């Protein structure tokens, strides 16, 4: 502000010029008549108009264009006003129902919000695995932040959160991180291997949410993966990738998660691979080859950079033949969801996702 004030001469003059010039232009554009086009006058309905509108509303809450036009002619208002009136009237109805029914819808909303929070948390690294994770929330729980991956890892790689992740792609990823989440996730992922296998568990969860899976895979890195896998967010892939890169290395060793590796190196490129990988993991858990899972984890973890990459790809591929394609898909994030589904135990995947 100060600097502007100090240069009134220049600034002001410039502005002054601009102002008048603009004014001059606007008139030709009809400026005077409509000084502010953005705001329309508030439409006031007469009682008779309201009666007509309410009568139609009683008949149908969603009148089609023909009905709206007919009413618009009757009451002398543009059809767009009629449309807006119905939109507002429906909103009013919903509000009344809500307050009447004692905020039934709110709880649901709240749930989702935790999920969202999860996302946040994952970013923040808070390790908040929302209980939400159980259902869609499962991913939310996964949401326990991936940031906390280390903790999660310590926790035993609460990979299960992955499942949650699947649900909430991003958050899920986060959740994935949280061991707590894991439980929920893992439960859903029937594969919830023992916690030690949490990673696998994750996997299984992952499987379910491949993306989540990815997350799981990322298990430690669920977050990133989850995001990627979940891709639900859309930015997940990159996310994972960055996540992977970043967190992976740190958590990786400790986590031992195969995910890390995926996350890490493969993340971006391998993101898909990672995803695939996840899938496979999921498989393992499914098969309950926790040992297997673990192996994978270690494997990744050790070679997580190069090996992981190869692994990812390979594994992914293995697990889901279409892996290659999937991989690229995964890459896209898309792949996560669809591919994962396809490749993965679809059933579990789907289940998770749904």
UniProtKB/Swiss-Prot annotation:
Residue segments, region Disordered: 91-146, 257-305
Superkingdom, taxonomy of origin: Eukaryota
An example molecular function term from Gene Ontology annotations: DNA-binding transcription factor activity, RNA polymerase II-specific
First-listed, main subcellular location of the protein, grouped into a coarse class: nucleus
GO cellular component terms listed in the entry, alphabetical order: chromatin; nucleus
Keyword Ubl conjugation appears in the UniProt entry: yes
Biased composition (Basic residues): 274-284, 291-302
UniProt note on tissues of expression: Expressed in brain. Detected in the anterior part of the neural fetal retina (at protein level).
UniProt keyword Membrane present: no
Glycyl lysine isopeptide (Lys-Gly) (interchain with G-Cter in SUMO2), cross-linked positions: 344
Composition skew (Low complexity), residue ranges: 117-146
Localization per record: Nucleus
GO terms classed as biological process: anterior/posterior pattern specification; diencephalon morphogenesis; inner ear morphogenesis; metencephalon development; midbrain development; positive regulation of transcription by RNA polymerase II; regulation of transcription by RNA polymerase II
DNA-binding region as annotated in the record: 38-97
Family membership: Belongs to the paired homeobox family. Bicoid subfamily.
Role this protein plays: Probably plays a role in the development of the brain and the sense organs. Can bind to the BCD target sequence (BTS): 5'-TCTAATCCC-3'.
Protein name as annotated: Homeobox protein OTX1
Organism of this sequence: Homo sapiens (Human)
Source taxonomy: Eukaryota, Metazoa, Chordata, Craniata, Vertebrata
